[in-house]
């Protein structure tokens, strides 16, 4: 009786090993050696959502990076809305003849803040003396 019990136990163990190895073999799948990068999958729920560039800050979380500009940035004059060609603030000639002036209408022309009065900028041009110096301000 013992021999039939041992043979049936051996048959069960051998059968378990055979079925276990068959299950392992059937569970394997073919993995390509070089994956195709053109076959990118995106979810199609309501709209096509493409992954956006993000940055991970440890301890804070993940943030979206701003999108790259598709068009180049052209600065414009906020007063007239016209594009600036020089890239800076346009000079004002005061409605007089040729030659650029550094004084803007309504702007503060002083080099040092002086709440009592405005003094012209000490440059060669309008408001300067004969040798390029600013004339003294007369006191009352």
UniProtKB/Swiss-Prot annotation:
Main location per the UniProt record: secreted
Localization in the cell: Secreted, Cell wall
Highest rank taxon of the organism: Eukaryota
InterPro entries hit by this protein: Put_cell_wall
Induction: By gibberellins.
GO cellular component: extracellular region
Compositionally biased region (Gly residues): 85-98
Swiss-Prot/TrEMBL keywords: Cell wall, Secreted, Signal
Chain intervals for the UniProt region annotation (Disordered): 85-140
Expression across tissues: Inflorescence.
Signal peptide per UniProt: 1-21
Protein's name in the database: Putative cell wall protein
